[in-house]
Amino acid sequence: MAYCIGFIVTEEAESEIITQEVFPAEVARREVLVQTVRPGETEEAAQNLLRAGAQALVARGGNFRDLQKSVSDVPLVELVMRTPDVLQALNGRVEDYDQIWLVLSKFVRFDFDSCRALLPAKVHCFRYGPVEEMLAFLASLDAPLNTLIIGSGFVLEPARLRGFHAVQTRNSPDGVR
């Protein structure tokens, strides 16, 4: 029997990259399983994937950190979000907005200060640890409605509830491979 890997992601679009673009044959053979989660559902998703036959788990950011505390019986692999992934989310969008906020987990490997000279002044960055910090930031953000929020799947809903446009950062297909 082939090895089975379970991916835990935060948005359906991420799931589609894995299932349709990167690993369609492996998904068809049930060698790759994917589960989309909301905040607080990571450990339950891991257990579901393990019951379904996953022999290793892949997650990123806070989900990966949560699983480090609770999963010890199978390999756990971190899917890392990097600078090119964040910059790709900006691609073609800068001109359309009055302000852009990169709302990124502290686990995203993105050095805003190093990129600052390449980005227009209307691009700002907020880094958060616990999800509660991100929620508090978005709740108090004083920005025009024509603001774009770029971040993980957990950022999208609270940003949209405030009336902001929101786009998710995604790992490139090469990064997932």
Range-by-range predicted roles:
Residues 1-177:
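Non-catalytic structural scaffold of enzyme domains
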